[in-house]
Amino acid sequence: MRLLPRAGYLRAVSTAGASADTILADGRRFERDEWTNAPPSILARIPRRLHAQPSHPIGIIRALIADHFAQLSGFRSMLAPSPVVTVAQNFDELGFAPDHPGRSRSDTYYLDRAHLLRTHTSAHEVEIFGSGHERWLLAADVYRRDEIDASHYPVFHQMEGAFVCARERAMETFEAPTIALEAAVERAGLVVEDDLPRGGPSNPYQDAHDPAMAAIIVRSLKAHLNSLVLALFGRLATEDGQPLKVRWIEATFPWTGPSFEVEVFFRGKWLEILGCGVMQQHALERSGVGHKVGWAFGLGLERLAMVLFSIPDIRLFWSTDDRFLSQFGAERGLDTTFKPYSRFPALYQDISFWLPDASFHANDFYEIVREVAGDLVEDTVLVRRQPRLG
């Protein structure tokens, strides 16, 4: 296994408050058991809350999206509470199968058998719908064990949004604002590539939905998100004098149907920016609002921030270096292009080791690397695997 360290110094991670038998996460103490695998370096990220910092790139993008939807249709924007959730909240209440790979210790950070660090914003979906919210946005830090490179990090930030209403009010609730939004998008000159068949066999309407109602929900979804694309990319994407282009692609997601991915043509290439769709009725039923219908979307804030600010490495978001942080500000919005600062030349280190059995997962090794070197390692590459003979 080859490691590519980043320039800098190793940093000690405090484990104050923890013991050999307990683990401390966000002020709560948990008894260690056979499921516990959340390391101190990950737990130390919890208080940072980058999405709540108004002058941080993640916080800037979150606030821009929240402000846009508040002006459009009065969406309520929320920040998720503690990332410590139960297995029931993160998996069971959302219909994850008992053998779903996302439940694996190789993918998820467990505090004990019953508690973990949320892996998606949807862990709070049932609670939000149950509170009666119909137009909402939720931003959160989420945690997943992952590989080591410039585009992956075990802590990242998601933003989820939904617009629902009672079934009998669907046509009147969605239709009027949709017509107004479609007209505004057309006036702005957005070029929309969307020749998908409505309710076609490859991306059908749900059996529980009247086709006319489903069609207006899809139109509402597309109008709102086309408007969001304009708000985020409109000025930057027209630097070359060409109109902004967006395209809609059929997709498959477990909680929506029909489902779509949205791509924007930005600086010479198509970029996927979010996934969305009409909410599955059984998902709303699990949340106790089966009498309602509507749409939802989800996006990664890091992905948008990396594109809009030209940030080349996802790990830079966690930097406390003033050379990084001073480049951004809430008052400047998107008027910032990241300027790289010097780093020492790369250094390669090769490591060889024997595995006692085949159950060892690559993510287990990545975790060891992060614990020892923090974010100093840029990349890990498996150079060769030698089978045991005899």
Residue ranges and their predicted role:
Residues 3-385:
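TRNA-recognition modules of translation machinery and tRNA-sensing kinases, especially anticodon-binding
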